[in-house]
Regions:
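Hydrophobic alpha-helical and helix-loop surface patches within well-folded domains
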Residues: 172, 209-458, 666
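Extended, low-hydrophobicity, Ser/Thr/Pro/Gly-biased non-transmembrane segments
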Residues: 17, 99-196, 221, 432, ...
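Short acidic/polar inter-strand loop motif in beta-rich domains
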Residues: 101-109, 464, 521-526
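N-terminal, polar/Ser/Thr-rich
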Residues: 1-34, 110-121, 130, 429-433
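Long, ordered, helix-rich scaffold segments
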Residues: 345-346, 374, 469-471, 482, ...
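Beta-strand-rich binding/interaction modules
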Residues: 59-66, 428-431, 439-517, 639
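Surface-exposed beta-strand/loop patches in extracellular or lumenal glycoproteins
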Residues: 40-59, 134-137, 143-152, 415, ...
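A surface-exposed beta-strand-loop module
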Residues: 44-46, 50-116, 498-512
Length: 852
């Protein structure tokens, strides 16, 4: 077996050759697309060397240099490269002209040029362009592009501005130099909706969203969102759109959520097509967030791009943070922050604790596709949020202006970003930027003392779980101090902790107060603080920061579960007091809905692994006991609420707002597995015109023999809608008991509407089983592990990205009891041996196996 060769950050070498301009001419055919390319190269000063181009599975017909034909037998073809000897190259500038043949119809990887239901689509980030054309496929080589597309399709699109649009060909020119990963082409019999936007400088931009005709009427929300994002970026960051057109295409077969190709964004259709009756309220918000994210990339990613893929944290961290700021302005700011924090803890904290942990800016990788992670995206965004909190909004925007000014049109590094901010601030930021360079979630240990009339709180940094190396970080700790009556003894303050330990002190107090920590989750840390239950109750009742209230409720959940797990008394005292506090928050329905969300198995497992070896069976038993107690306390509240909800016909979209529906859905979910709401739910399921409520009812019906017809009815009514079909698939898998989940898995994967090569289908069934049905996956006999390993083996040869993503379901096996680890290890060992797995999947698999 050949030694694994990692790419290392320290090995970066600037390119000797540059691509000044790229001209591509496509003659589209599903099975035999011909591409003629002309690339103008220049060589930087230095000794001439061979020209090494990247390319995979490319059938080259001919190659010319400055018009002179070069025999293919004089070139060196590697598995992923084409080497042109230096003797054929010009002294400084020269043109390479090539023709190659592609077969989009057989491309199941969904990278490069492929077909999605008859539509030609490309995906080039990070290294897909090399599957289209031999080139310098690296992000620090920026070129202008001219693209001509021949074919008999209604619309043939590429980056930049249209030069010519005719019946049988189109031509596009992008005047802004870009790396190859931002190239895009789409062609097919699509229809479109359009709008216009006038920038602050007076430029008129045409906006079009292209989609298949079956989706007519579903692009209006997206068009509104694009215009809002454009205006927001102008007002908040001074960034105008720079092309004459902004096009988006929705396709059904797409590995990612969306892609920010310059002037031609490509979206997974589930994240952009929306209508009031068949989309949920969360779909509404998610569509807006993803549209904003991809649009904001126009500056943080496109105009300013990455020098190499180790800098991915910069473009994605900045863009995720900007997207988060935007969404806080569009929806309820505090609820948005709860959702961001919830996602971070459930995904990034879990990643940081396991064998796939890595720094936000990694120093090595085997397969770059594997580093599109929660750490690179969400943790990087949290680091940038902390920077803004510490230096203030005004200085942060000055730093961003400096960054855009210095790096526009460049492929830059994290260090460039750091230097631009240092220039504005006049201070060294090296210690703060350590956040990007070390893996793991820091622990913040808190202790408090009340002696005499003095209250002292001490903060101490500790190393993360499973990481021996740790440098003390600079972090903002936002806090409030309140008494048991809800009076705040001082306004919100932010302590910048820049050493291992520090303290704050309040004097001349008559009684011990309570401290409410990490308001708005000001730093991505794990807090270790044995705070009294009375203090937690005071924070839950009186704190005005929603995120702190939400985190406090979680702490009380864990305390109650600890008591259940160890058969301690007084669990109901906690639940009773929480109930009394929560029912008085009806004026904050969105917050109440978030507080009513029960802990899920994965969440509880992640919490337990910090201190013990969690047993899946015990987790299930304890959580069910806890949920049953909660249901009992909230039963009358739920019945009373739904009587009013039904009486006022608030199940109709026009009679309610999303806050009201959010609370209704939370109560339905809280009471799943019961039947005392059935009369209300049947009315909602059969007559509501809001999909959030219908899907919540569907969740409640899973596993109930008396509700099988309702589950079937949902499919018959909405099965032709691909987004709802996948919700129907996923709901049956996620909320089934283990035995039923296995049955459903086999039933749904043989369903006539299931296509394993469609990423949305695969994730909704296989991915949901592996990652969202904790107890079905973690079976003592190892059957869940074997089931998923078999699917990984099936999909890996066709789509390595999906296979690698699914393999990550095994990342926390190391924390389970030995009986589970042994079964998983045997399964993974069988999977890794003799299957010739892709680099994507092997990298993930090897790291997990090494941890067992």
């Amino acid at each position: 077996m050949a030694a694994v060769k990692y790419k290392l950050l320290k090995d970066y070498v600037p390119p000797i050759y540059r691509q000044q301009s790229v001209s591509l001419e496509f003659f589209l055919d599903p099975e035999k697309t011909i591409l003629k390319s002309k690339i103008q190269f220049s060589r930087d000063n230095g000794i001439p060397t061979d020209l090494v181009l990247q390319g995979e599975n490319i059938l080259l017909s001919y190659l010319k240099i400055d018009g002179k034909n070069i025999g293919l037998d004089l070139l060196t073809f590697g598995k992923h490269t084409l080497v042109i000897p230096k003797k054929f190259l010009g002294p400084r500038d020269f043109q390479v002209e090539m023709e190659n043949i592609l077969d989009p119809s057989t491309n199941k990887t969904l990278e490069g040029l492929y077909l999605s239901e008859g539509i030609f689509v490309t995906q080039c980030e990070p290294e897909g362009f090399r599957k289209i054309c031999y080139s310098l496929d690296r992000p620090d080589v920026l070129s202008t592009y001219t693209v001509r597309i021949h074919g008999s399709y209604a619309h043939m699109l590429s980056n930049g501005n249209p030069i010519t649009i005719s019946n049988n060909y189109s031509e596009w020119r992008d005047p802004f130099p870009k790396p190859s990963y931002l190239f895009a082409l789409v062609a097919g019999d699509l229809i479109f909706d359009e709008e216009t936007f006038t920038t602050l400088s007076g430029k008129l931009v045409k906006i079009k969203i292209f989609y298949q005709k079956e989706h007519i009427g579903k692009a209006n929300h997206a068009l509104i969102c694009i215009k809002k994002a454009m205006a927001w970026d102008e007002i908040n960051y001074g960034r105008e759109y720079d092309l004459d057109v902004f096009n988006i295409v929705a396709v059904d077969d797409f590995n990612a959520g969306a892609m920010e190709n310059k002037g031609l964004n490509i979206f997974n259709s589930k994240y952009i097509l929306y209508d009031d009756e068949t989309s949920t309220d969360s779909d509404f918000a998610l569509t807006e967030a993803i549209i904003a994210h991809e649009y904001f990339h126009n500056w943080t990613g496109n105009r300013v791009t990455c020098r190499d893929w180790f800098q991915l944290c910069l473009k994605e961290g900045l863009t995720v943070f900007r997207e988060q700021e935007y969404m806080e302005d569009q929806l309820e700011k505090e609820i948005s922050r709860i959702n961001q924090t919830d996602f971070l803890i459930k995904n990034q904290f879990k990643e940081d604790a396991g064998p796939l942990s890595h720094s936000a800016r990694p120093t090595r990788y085997l397969e770059i596709n594997n580093f599109y992670t929660a750490t690179v995206y969400e943790k990087s965004a949290e680091i940038i949020r902390m920077l803004k909190k510490i230096i203030g909004r005004e200085k942060f925007l000055e730093g961003m202006d400096q960054f855009f000014k210095n790096q526009d049109g460049c492929a830059c590094t994290l260090e460039d970003f750091q230097k631009d901010f240092e220039l504005v601030l006049g201070k060294n930021l090296e210690k703060f930027f350590k956040w990007f360079h070390e893996p793991g979630t820091p622990k913040l240990a808190i202790s408090e003392k009340f002696v005499g009339k003095n209250y002292k709180v001490t903060f101490r940094q500790e190393k993360p779980i499973n990481h021996l190396k740790y440098s003390n970080k600079v972090m903002p700790i936002t806090y409030k101090i309140l008494n048991s009556k809800g009076q705040f003894l001082q306004p919100e303050k932010t302590l910048v902790l820049d050493q291992k330990t520090t303290s704050i002190e309040l004097k001349n107090l008559s009684k011990k107060p309570a401290i409410s920590l990490l308001n708005s989750f000001s730093a991505p840390v794990i807090v270790e603080f044995k705070q009294s239950i009375d203090d937690l109750f005071a924070i839950l009742e009186f704190e005005t920061d929603f995120t702190s209230v939400w985190m406090t409720k979680k702490k009380l959940d864990y305390i109650a579960l600890e008591k259940i797990a160890s058969d301690q008394p007084n669990v109901e005292n906690i639940i009773s007091r929480v109930y009394e506090i929560l029912i008085n928050k009806m004026d904050k329905r969105s917050l109440l809905a978030k507080l009513l969300e029960p802990l899920n198995d994965n969440e509880y497992f992640s919490r337990l692994l910090e201190t013990t070896t969690p047993d899946p069976k015990a987790i299930q038993t304890d959580l069910r006991k806890y949920e049953d107690l909660y249901k009992r306390y909230f039963k009358e509240f739920s019945i009373t609420y739904f009587k009013s909800f039904i009486h006022n016909r608030q199940y109709l979209r026009e009679n309610s707002n999303y806050q009201e529906r959010l609370l209704a859905c939370a109560l339905i979910f809280l009471n799943r597995g019961t039947n005392f709401l059935d009369d209300f739910l049947d009315i909602i399921f059969n007559t509501s015109n809001n999909m959030s409520l219908k899907v919540s009812c569907l969740v409640n019906y899973i596993g109930r023999n008396d509700k099988k017809e309702n589950i079937k009815k949902f499919y018959l009514q909405y099965g032709k809608n691909k987004v709802l079909l996948n919700k129907w698939f996923a709901t049956q898998i996620q909320y089934s008991t283990p035995k039923l989940a296995f049955d459903r898995l086999r039933e749904l994967t043989t369903h006539s509407d299931f296509n394993m090569f469609n990423p949305n289908n695969f994730h909704s069934v296989i991915g949901t089983f592996a990652k969202r049905n904790f107890h079905a996956f973690h079976q003592k006999d190892g059957s869940g592990y074997k089931e998923i390993a078999d699917w990984i083996k099936k999909i890996d040869p066709e789509n390595p990205q999906i296979a690698a993503s699914t393999t990550k379901a095994f990342e926390q096996i190391k924390f389970l009891p030995n009986i589970y680890r042994k079964k998983a290890k045997a399964t993974l060992n069988t999977l890794s041996k003799g299957n010739n797995l892709s680099k994507d999947t092997s990298e993930i698999l090897n790291k997990i196996e090494a941890s067992l």
